[in-house]
Amino acid sequence: MITTFDKIVNDLAQLDFFSGYKFRKRDYSLFFKTESGKQFIELDHWRDRDTTSSLVIYPIYGVRFDVLHKWFEKFSVKTLQDQRDRASISFSGSMLGLQDELNFDTNGDGYSKEFENFQIILKCAEYVFSEYSSLDKLYNKTILPVLDGETGLPDVGVDWIFIDMALCKLVAPANFDKLKQIILSHVEKMYAHQEPNILDYYD
């Protein structure tokens, strides 16, 4: 039997873990709506250039809290759909110390074993969806280390700035001014290095 991306998605949907999930074709994601937003696995995929019979799937695991994105919507240069498709935080497999890409033989050879191996995505998803299941957990893992000087800030992108500030304002408003100063100082450095995304918001 020929292995296709649609077959893999259909088989995933039969697993108990994905009960209640829906598949959205425009970004190839399995997502579950929560009270505060959504949890999702985006399944980027392509044919291997060197081995045309190999289908490569690259999962991204994300959690979104709508409240962290709402205020910035009217200022963003991105389309509303693009903004609302985005996660508040996301990970690849390697960021979790696990496998990034998973391969399937499109001829169907060894499909059962490959699909069993593919279920490593459940381990990744369970971790992300549990460890980042609330604003408090997200704050403790992403904002506190910045405030304590244990980790730095991203050198690219813009969305994270407003997500982090909104998160701090909601969870720990007493720390908002401190975080704001850290972020503003970092943004000035990004601007000095002509980071393209930052330039979109400077006159």
Regions found by a protein language model. Name each.
Residues 2-24:
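Amphipathic alpha-helical segments
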Residues 2-5, 32-203:
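Intrinsically disordered, low-complexity regulatory regions enriched in serine/threonine/proline
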